[in-house]
Amino acid sequence: MSVEMDFDLGPLTWIKGELDNALDAAGAALADWNGQDITPLKAAAAHLHQVYGALQIVDLQGVSLLTSETERLLSEMAEQVEKRHHETVDTVLRAIAALKAYLDGLMAGAPHAELKLSPIYQEVVARRGGEPPAPSELFYPDTATRASRQEPEMPLDDAARTRAIHGARSQYQRGLLLFLQNRDAMAGLTQMELAVRQVERLAPGAAQFTFWWTAAGLMEMLRRGRVPTDNWLKRVCGRVDLQMRRLMEGSRQLADRLFRDVLYYVAQDDASEGRGAEVRQHFQLQRLRRFLQ
């Protein structure tokens, strides 16, 4: 599978009845809530905990996350009188309805794109008083797929590779500073792209190559003004620098969340040429664009 829209309904079919019953029970417990009684809140939380447990046998990370956050919100309402508002229960009921609609949609053949749950997920998190989640929070592309090298991997020993990556990282950091401080953003983005493309050539192994090949697509899009620059994207650029440092220090472990975030922003564009287009085709991201915020 290359995108989250492909989904095996088998395991969900086995537990769908249990999920429906528990979600219905959670909604029923809250239907006539009087604004103060904590018993319905605890009952609804318990039913959502049952839903969360049942979901562990299916690959529905976003659905599980929304369920867990909604359960936590109910538990906090039961424990903290200042959080007991009818508006908050309304949010919970809409979250339950969104979960039911999403699961029903999957069973009816709707695309599996958990980004559709982002608006209600963000509202639940806000009701809890948490930091706003990243726009890519419910974006789950298949980061295990690998891109093919056009040239053989560079035959470098560890010391030579470290030196070369160190040089590329220094260039990236200079460009990142220009970009973040908006002093000469275009020059900064050009340096960042050149540095990432150099690391792409130096990357050892298929997994590292695929990540840096993808990151180069994002840098190209930034330089061309093909993706809106927001604070989340700036954070992603900073985390790319940290990933560069890890590689320079000899670690081949990839941060899956960073990979997802890079792909999320690459998916924003619809250009038919350039590295970004190659990345979107490789990961079939075009199919998800209509669900992006």
Spans of model-derived segments:
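Structural secondary-structure packing elements that flank or coincide with functional cores
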Residues: M1-L9, V81-D158, G225-Q293
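Short, well-ordered alpha-helical segments
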Residues: P40-A44, V58-L73, E87-A95, A206-M219, ...
